[in-house]
């Protein structure tokens, strides 16, 4: 089946590669225009464009899909020439206008990383981890004018592991979802797939802003653990130390039974939310329930570092500033 692929970021590359390796003909890709990145602000192609060019596939990079614009009209003309039977979509990042949806025989088919109608929207993987869901998955559906509301074509399930970060889970879903997308194209081609309307209560995963990633240390420890993993690696869970913003990597929960085995049990059980306790080989932070043990932390202008090394730096500063070297630090 002749298809055009629409996608932009790294997770979309996996699906494109699997489609290229299938018997389907990827006649072209649609992706976002080159973007400026890095300190030099030089132009870089999207990951999807880079892969397409490696395989000699035509690349279309319209700034808009709106009819009546130069880019939008040029895209429509090219689509008419290529005449794809379906346009699979993975994280393309541009609004698909209503008149375009009916152009391919089988429509525009989106790969969404949740079990719809659960977690419609921009950040379904992060939302599933933060909510404490035990399972999620991927869904292929025919795009309509709603927000992830189209008829379902196929689904697959994936277990969320207790230590999964958003990156861990998204990586697994990208590979399994890529296979699902190929299977969906196969089913549309041979007529074995019958679109089904979405059923059940919808939930929504809004686009994540930097402020959303801030850690609330008054929350219970399991909520904080999930919040940090959900925002790792991007945009990165963060907290304030004075006026400095620090990114915090995944933490480990200090279980109540474990407290009795630690040398500073009294100090740890009395930690207030956000209060930091520096020991010889670890850094603990108080929460709304039991403490957490920091794994990695990123001070401003530096790379991620071992939290124990960061804690020793704090101890050194304290010993220079006050007799006895007592470390009194609190995140906010």
Swiss-Prot record:
CDD domains named among the record's database cross-references: FMT_core_Met-tRNA-FMT_N, Met_tRNA_FMT_C
One GO cellular component term: cytosol
Keyword Protein biosynthesis in record: yes
Annotated positions binding (6S)-5,6,7,8-tetrahydrofolate: 114-117
InterPro entries: Fmt, Formyl_trans_C, Formyl_transf_N, Formyl_transf_N_sf, Formyl_transferase-like_C_sf, Met-tRNA-FMT_C, Met-tRNA-FMT_N
Cystine connections: none
NCBIfam families hit by this protein: fmt
Family per similarity comment: Belongs to the Fmt family.
Xref: PANTHER family: METHIONYL-TRNA FORMYLTRANSFERASE, METHIONYL-TRNA FORMYLTRANSFERASE, MITOCHONDRIAL
Name listed for the protein in its UniProt record: Methionyl-tRNA formyltransferase
Organism field: Corynebacterium aurimucosum (strain ATCC 700975 / DSM 44827 / CIP 107346 / CN-1) (Corynebacterium nigricans)
Chain's gene name: fmt
């Amino acid at each position: 089946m002749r298809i055009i692929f629409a996608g932009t970021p790294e997770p979309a590359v996996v699906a494109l590669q699997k489609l290229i390796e299938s018997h389907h003909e990827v006649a072209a890709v649609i992706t976002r225009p080159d973007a400026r990145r890095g300190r030099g602000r030089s132009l870089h192609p999207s990951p999807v464009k880079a892969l397409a060019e490696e395989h000699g596939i035509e690349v279309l990079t319209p700034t808009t899909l709106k009819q009546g614009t130069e880019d939008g009209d040029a895209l429509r003309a090219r689509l008419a020439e290529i005449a794809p039977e379906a346009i699979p979509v993975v994280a393309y990042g541009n609004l698909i206008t209503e008149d375009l949806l009916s152009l391919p025989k089988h429509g525009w088919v989106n790969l969404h990383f949740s079990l719809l109608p659960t977690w419609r929207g921009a950040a379904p993987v992060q939302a599933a981890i933060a909510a404490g869901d035990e399972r999620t998955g991927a869904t292929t559906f025919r795009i309509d004018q709603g927000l992830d509301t189209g008829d379902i074509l196929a689904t697959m399930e994936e277990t969320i592991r207790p230590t999964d970060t958003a990156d861990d889970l998204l990586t697994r879903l990208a590979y399994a979802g890529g296979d699902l997308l190929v299977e969906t194209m196969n089913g549309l081609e041979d007529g074995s797939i019958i679109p089904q309307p979405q059923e059940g209560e919808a939930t929504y995963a809004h686009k994540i802003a930097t402020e959303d990633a801030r850690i609330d240390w008054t929350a219970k420890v399991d909520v904080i653990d999930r919040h940090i993993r959900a925002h790792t690696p991007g945009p990165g869970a963060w907290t304030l130390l004075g006026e400095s913003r620090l990114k915090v990597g995944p933490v480990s929960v200090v279980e109540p039974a474990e407290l009795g085995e630690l040398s500073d049990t009294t100090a740890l059980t009395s930690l207030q939310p956000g209060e930091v306790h520096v020991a010889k080989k670890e850094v603990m932070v108080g929460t709304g329930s039991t403490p957490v043990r920091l794994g990695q932390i990123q001070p401003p202008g530096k790379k991620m570092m071992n939290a124990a090394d960061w804690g020793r730096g704090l101890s050194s500063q304290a010993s220079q500033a006050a007799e006895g070297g007592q470390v009194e630090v609190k995140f906010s």
